[in-house]
């Protein structure tokens, strides 16, 4: 009897939270924006970037020859005016993320709500993608989700640099399901990050049955200028009801480029200087149209103005 009541209350809580989220989004009417700290590969940088004003961070995952994620690291070259050499062992980094996204933990950071796992799978053969997904899921389940017991609450994006590595998604999804926690996949989204043609990206998702939870990235290092034509194409596909739910751009560090990206309709801006986006969001032309996303904003729901 007590178990039955607990299950009812648990389900009510989940549906109630979703209803509150929908009401909040309708009530505000501004597009939620994810301020995405770029290349956060050291544990100490997590706190640094949150203190600088991000609600999301991106980090680079390197694999060994067997497709096992080993450490966070970008290496040379990287963005201009940044240190390229910070790194941590993957398990230790995930544990640090869990502490900072678990309510009640002494290290908890309420505003940190989304991660981007920039997976450097180009070092792998195409036929290793599935196993890489299995290995990613195994480590994330253990170190971040605490084996399914009160793990971190953040959403995250598996960002893949190669369209031929779509089976990574399948390996990840099947592993979490086999561990008896398919509900955790509600926290997981996807991105192909190599600036491929949008129709080709959609075909890759189709091969593994992905129809939602999709963020589409576009960008280049801050050392080089890049136009917004592909961003606008992705935004158009998003707004037409296609597989894309959100669009983000990287790496944007200038005030003018930040304004241009917001004008183009992006949902997220990846940056080395979070204060730039935060300052722009306070400007008269933007403060009534955009706001910083919170945990109550579902990152897999396409915003409707």
Curated annotation (Swiss-Prot):
GO terms for cellular component: extracellular region. Residues 1-18 form the signal peptide. It is an enzyme of class 4 (lyase). It is found in: Secreted. Keywords: Cytolysis, Dermonecrotic toxin, Disulfide bond, Hemolysis, Lipid degradation, Lipid metabolism, Lyase, Magnesium, Metal-binding, Secreted, Signal, Toxin, Zymogen. It comes from the Eukaryota. Residues 19-26 form a propeptide. Its cofactor is Mg(2+). Its main location: secreted. It catalyses: an N-(acyl)-sphingosylphosphocholine = an N-(acyl)-sphingosyl-1,3-cyclic phosphate + choline; an N-(acyl)-sphingosylphosphoethanolamine = an N-(acyl)-sphingosyl-1,3-cyclic phosphate + ethanolamine; a 1-acyl-sn-glycero-3-phosphocholine = a 1-acyl-sn-glycero-2,3-cyclic phosphate + choline; a 1-acyl-sn-glycero-3-phosphoethanolamine = a 1-acyl-sn-glycero-2,3-cyclic phosphate + ethanolamine. It holds the Pfam family GDPD_2. Disulfide bonds join 78-84, 80-223. GO terms for molecular function: lyase activity; metal ion binding; phospholipase activity; phosphoric diester hydrolase activity; toxin activity. Expressed by the venom gland. Transmembrane segments: none annotated. Mg(2+) binds at residues 58, 60, 118. Belongs to the arthropod phospholipase D family. Class II subfamily. Class IIa sub-subfamily. Dermonecrotic toxins cleave the phosphodiester linkage between the phosphate and headgroup of certain phospholipids (sphingolipid and lysolipid substrates), forming an alcohol (often choline) and a cyclic phosphate. This toxin acts on sphingomyelin (SM) wih high activity. It may also act on ceramide phosphoethanolamine (CPE), lysophosphatidylcholine (LPC) and lysophosphatidylethanolamine (LPE), but not on lysophosphatidylserine (LPS), and lysophosphatidylglycerol (LPG). It acts by transphosphatidylation, releasing exclusively cyclic phosphate products as second products. This is Dermonecrotic toxin LiSicTox-alphaII1.
């Amino acid at each position: 009897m007590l178990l039955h009541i607990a299950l009812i209350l648990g389900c009510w809580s989940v549906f109630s939270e979703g209803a509150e989220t929908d009401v909040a989004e309708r009530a505000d009417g501004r597009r939620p924006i994810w301020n995405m700290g770029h290349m956060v590969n050291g544990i100490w940088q997590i706190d640094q970037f949150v203190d600088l004003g991000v609600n999301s961070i991106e980090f680079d995952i390197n694999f060994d020859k067997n497709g096992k994620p080993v450490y966070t690291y970008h290496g040379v070259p990287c963005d201009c005016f940044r240190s390229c050499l910070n790194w941590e062992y993957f398990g230790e980094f995930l544990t640090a993320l869990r502490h900072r996204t678990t309510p009640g933990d002494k290290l908890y950071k309420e505003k940190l709500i989304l991660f981007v796992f920039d997976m450097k799978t180009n070092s792998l053969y195409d036929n290793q993608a599935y196993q890489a997904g299995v290995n990613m899921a195994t480590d994330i389940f253990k170190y971040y989700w605490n084996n399914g017991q009160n793990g971190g609450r953040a959403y995250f994006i598996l960002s893949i640099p190669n369209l031929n590595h779509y089976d990574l998604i399948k390996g990840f999804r099947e592993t979490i399901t086999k561990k008896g926690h398919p509900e955790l996949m509600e926290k997981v989204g996807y991105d192909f990050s190599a600036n491929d043609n949008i129709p080709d990206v959609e075909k890759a998702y189709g091969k593994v049955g992905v129809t939602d939870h999709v963020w589409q990235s576009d960008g280049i290092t801050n050392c080089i200028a890049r136009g917004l034509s592909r961003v606008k194409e992705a935004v158009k596909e998003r707004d037409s009801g296609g597989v894309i739910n959100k669009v983000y751009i990287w790496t944007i560090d200038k005030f003018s480029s930040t304004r241009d990206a917001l004008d183009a309709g992006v949902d997220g801006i990846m940056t080395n200087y979070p204060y730039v986006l935060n300052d722009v969001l306070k400007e008269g032309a933007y403060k009534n149209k955009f706001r910083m996303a919170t945990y109550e904003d579902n990152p897999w729901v396409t915003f409707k103005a």
